Amino acid sequence: MYSEKFSAQVRDVIEQARSANEDVQVIVRFQSAASQRSIARLAVGAGAIKVNQDFRLIPATAVTLKPSALDELTDAEDVAEIWLDEVVHILLDVSTPHIRAPQVWEQMHNDGEGVTICVVDTGIDATHPDFAGRVGLTADFSGKGSAADGNGHGTHVASTAAGTGAASGGKYVGVAPGATIMAAKALADNGSGRMSNVMAGLEWAAQNGADVLNLSLGSRGNSDGSDALSSMCNAIVDMGKIMVVAAGNSGPRQSTIGSPGAAEKVITVGASNDQDSVARFSSRGPTADGRVKPDLVAPGSKIVAARASGTSVGQVVDEYYTTASGTSMAAPHVAGLVALMLRADSGLGPMDIKKMLMATSVDINISENEQTEGDKFIMGDGRVDALTAVQYAQSGQQPPPHKPSLPVPSPPSPGPSPPIGCMAAPFRFLKLDRFLPME
């Protein structure tokens, strides 16, 4: 009889491993950090379990074990739960004019300077001109040995959040071009990796100065947000960090929010297109336990952003840029917007930011066959509006709790602008309809 400490998914994988005489990779959550240390030593001594990663923000350890060793773990009173160390994948897909970011740069002289965004992804091409002087700490958790991006997805995501557009003469500028970029390479150059690698990258970023963390990746299927990666994301929000996560590209089917998009405390972002409608590919809610997700949507159709040298993600524009679609591209729009909000008021907490973003979002169109009372499961509270959100952030006031409809209501008069230079160059994104699914 199997223990209630692990799910049917874990049971299925264990049975397959037994039949094939293969090891299994799982994440074990303990009742406390003390029990985590003692049982980890016991596991190593037994020889049937290899410890891959210990986590500090939650009492959990990623291990590789023989199926026969599960009895030892499940019988231990201090073991609370055993999760499968799943493989997660990048989530591949105009734009800032739609969310009114250029007005924030020009009218409020706010480009996100002083705020650090960490992209936990396939790494970054730190030599790209759009990141000159903007890349802070980098680290590798994929086993490659460096954070260099041999895939291109992480570079594109980082550019959307905070690229300067230098290689395009200011044409392709990220939402917060003054922000500092951190990069944690948690996914291999093939675009996939274990949950435990992503969790290690998140933990490193949270403990090394990241203000905003972006995850443009996820697992397949519908999640209830109780898995290992979602638990780590919630713990990081409890530290005071803002977590922005892509919803996934499994729409228009309902109940397609995977992990970590289903995590309760993160900002889960779906995608809109150039018609200001919800993109067909954008994953829909509810979560497996019936909660509303995504929280909101942002542009994610055919976004032009930085291309990592020698890579071919999306449709290549030129030596320095490529076009991609997906909620992967929507999430960094919001991560960049959060940086602008924190620049306006660094005292805002994660829930302040989330509530403000949702309350200032605007209604957009959805397809006729989805015009139901379940609209929140399609677009959350709507498409983000950068100008209104940042104006409220700077004013020190909370927006009204109800969701506004187009046109956007007038925000309060903002206070003094931070004394920084603004990005005066026009911002342009090209938009197409194709998206690259999770594969």
Tell what function each PLM region has.
Residues 212-214, 298, 343-439:
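C-terminal subdomain of the subtilisin-like protease fold in secreted/lumenal serine endopeptidases
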Residues 1-103, 117, 129, 423, ...:
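Autoinhibitory N-terminal propeptides
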Residues 26-29, 144-148, 187-191, 220, ...:
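Second-shell loop/turn segments in exported
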Residues 158-161, 182, 186-187, 256, ...:
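Hydrolase catalytic cores
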Residues 74-77, 83, 123, 128, ...:
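Sec/Tat-exported extracytoplasmic proteins
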Residues 26-27, 62, 116-119, 137, ...:
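Structural recognition of the beta-strand scaffold that forms the well-ordered cores
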Residues 35-37, 68, 164-168, 183-265, ...:
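Substrate-binding/access-modulating region of protease and related hydrolase catalytic domains
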Residues 105-137, 144-194, 208-211, 238, ...:
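Subtilisin-like serine protease catalytic core
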